[in-house]
């Protein structure tokens, strides 16, 4: 489905899949560049769709489900499959340029392979808990390290993490046990905090990290020395603002827009904080949020539980 934000309507629809996949629950990983939509899925297909010409440019069946986000570097599409194998594809024709096998995990959890990129390197965190730095041009491994605290891989202690964050100098890994700050050049540990986070952290002003702990503390941390600038109880802040009894808020996502922090709750409310940690506004969304929100032309878009697109200006 191609949705026009300006026209506020669906302008194009396209179905790649044959009837035999009609009842199969599909999970699509999507990235867009120059009116071409690149898609990988949990069946094993990888394909490119030209939005203007309304046609498939190419399609490949790798036969192993993809299980990562997408990245683009120059002529390369980069993705990983459920076996933790990293692939570099030619975005012109979909052919495989290179692949790098990494450690597999037989038991799967909700964590998916994660990719982050800067101008020189790709960072690949797999479900085993290993972090790889790979040169974007040569596709060779610079270094790798394992962040998993155990080799006993059972359902109770599988590695979990939020998405990788980097700022060209530091890599931030927020796992189920620790918050790691690593050196981009060699992967050495700068420092780590005994804090588990529930949402992807955000880097602000290049040297500060904003994140939410699993106990709903909103924390702003100095990335250079690891000191906390503030630590705020979100539950208490909401209770004080609304003059209600303190309850546990269930959080879905957060984003920065116009120098304000927006925190999305599972119960369809959105909390607007300034970057000093003060609540500016509490607003009910027009419908209950189903997908993770995205930002398009200063509008926040999401899909609700009726599969309708909603937006907030």
Q: How would you label these PLM feature ranges?
A:
Residues 287-313:
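Blade-level signature of beta-propeller repeat domains, shared across WD40, Kelch, NHL, RCC1
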Residues 1, 47, 87, 132, ...:
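WD40 beta-propeller blade core
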Residues 5-8, 50-54, 90-94, 135-139, ...:
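Short loop/turn segments that connect beta-strands within beta-propeller blades
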Residues 127, 172-190, 197-198, 206:
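Beta-propeller domains
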Residues 40, 80, 124-125, 173-174, ...:
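Residue-level marker for isolated small/hydroxyl-bearing positions within beta-strands
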Residues 9-34, 55-74, 96-119, 140-168, ...:
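Extracytoplasmic beta-rich repeat domains
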């Amino acid at each position: 489905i191609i949705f026009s934000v300006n026209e506020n309507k669906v302008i194009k629809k396209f179905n790649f899949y044959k009837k035999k996949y009609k009842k199969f629950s599909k999970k699509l990983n999507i990235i867009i560049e120059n009116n071409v939509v690149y898609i990988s899925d949990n069946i094993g297909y990888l394909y490119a769709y030209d939005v203007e010409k309304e046609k498939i440019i190419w399609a490949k069946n790798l036969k192993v489900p993809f299980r990562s986000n997408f990245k683009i570097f120059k002529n390369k599409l980069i993705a990983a499959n459920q076996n933790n194998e990293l692939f570099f594809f030619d975005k012109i024709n979909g052919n495989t340029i290179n692949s790098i096998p990494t450690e597999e995990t037989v038991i799967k959890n909700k964590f998916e392979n994660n990719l982050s990129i800067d101008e020189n390197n790709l960072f690949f965190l797999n479900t085993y808990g290993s972090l790889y730095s790979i040169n974007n041009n040569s596709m060779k491994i610079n270094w790798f390290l394992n962040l998993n605290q155990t080799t006993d891989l059972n359902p109770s202690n599988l590695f979990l993490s939020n998405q990788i964050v980097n700022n060209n100098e530091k890599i931030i890994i927020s796992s189920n046990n620790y918050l790691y700050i690593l050196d981009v050049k060699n992967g050495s540990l700068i420092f780590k905090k005994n804090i588990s986070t529930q949402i992807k952290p955000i880097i602000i002003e290049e040297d500060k990290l904003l994140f939410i702990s699993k106990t709903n503390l909103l924390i702003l941390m100095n990335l250079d020395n690891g000191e906390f600038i503030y630590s705020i109880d979100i539950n208490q802040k909401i209770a004080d603002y609304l003059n209600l009894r303190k309850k546990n808020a269930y959080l879905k996502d957060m984003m920065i827009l116009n120098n304000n922090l927006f925190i999305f709750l599972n119960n369809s409310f959105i909390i607007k904080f300034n970057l000093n940690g003060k609540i500016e506004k509490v607003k009910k969304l027009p419908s209950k949020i189903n997908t993770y929100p995205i930002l398009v032309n200063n509008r926040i878009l999401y899909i609700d539980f009726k599969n309708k697109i909603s937006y907030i200006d």
